[in-house]
């Protein structure tokens, strides 16, 4: 953390996708085994980690080791993917945000963002609307984690992105 007080790990739509190209299996994994070791060491040394992406839960739910990493280190559990609604509305941090759920000409579609729930002493920070499914968590312990089950960059409003990032940076800076 002395060199990198905050790490922003932006995953977008990245996931393990063996069906479309078997050769790329580990390259697109959200958190490969080596990356899990690096992020674990970073967190255990007191770092501040921001993680966002549509598949940060679903891509990690296929093995006990992957689930242990997300639950014990990143402090969230996977509750499912939001596939049944087309609403791109998310509430949290005193804001109502919008993400694109359908294909459009301006930004990539976030068709199935992950519902991630807090584990241990983590707490919810974002909720998908309607339905009240958890969309993001924060953890404050010997290190800090702020995780979003949707890509940060998919927040449509530039103003909302700036306000959310300012709130995250403030959370990381609190004593």
Q: What is the predicted role of each segment?
A:
Residues 1-2, 136:
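Short amphipathic alpha-helices and their capping/turn segments at secondary-structure boundaries
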Residues 2-7, 44-49, 143-144, 175:
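Loop/turn elements at helix/coil->beta-strand transitions in domains of secreted/extracellular proteins
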Residues 4-19, 53-54, 148-150:
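Short loop/turn segments at strand-loop or loop-helix junctions that form parts
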Residues 14-110, 120-122, 130:
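A glycine-rich, often tryptophan-bearing local segment used as a flexible ligand/cofactor-contacting loop or short
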Residues 61, 65-83, 118-123, 131-175:
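Extracellular ligand-binding/catalytic regions of CAZymes and related secreted enzymes
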Residues 112-115, 124:
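Glycan-recognition and catalytic regions of carbohydrate-active enzymes
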């Amino acid at each position: 953390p002395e060199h990198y007080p905050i790490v922003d790990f932006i995953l977008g739509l990245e996931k393990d996708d063996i069906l479309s190209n078997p050769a790329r299996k580990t390259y697109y994994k959200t958190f490969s085994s080596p990356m899990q070791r690096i992020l674990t060491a970073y967190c255990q040394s007191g770092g501040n980690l921001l993680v966002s992406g549509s598949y940060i839960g679903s891509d990690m739910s296929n093995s006990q080791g992957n689930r242990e990493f997300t639950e014990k280190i990143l402090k969230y559990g996977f509750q499912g993917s939001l596939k049944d609604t087309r609403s791109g509305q998310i509430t949290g941090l005193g804001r109502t945000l919008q993400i694109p759920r359908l294909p459009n000409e301006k930004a990539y579609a976030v068709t199935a963002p992950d519902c991630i729930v807090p584990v241990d002493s983590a707490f919810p920070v974002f909720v998908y609307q309607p339905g009240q499914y958890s969309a993001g968590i924060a953890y404050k312990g010997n290190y800090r984690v702020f995780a979003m089950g949707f890509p940060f960059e998919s927040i449509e409003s530039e103003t909302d992105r700036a306000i959310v990032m300012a709130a995250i940076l403030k959370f990381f800076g609190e004593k």
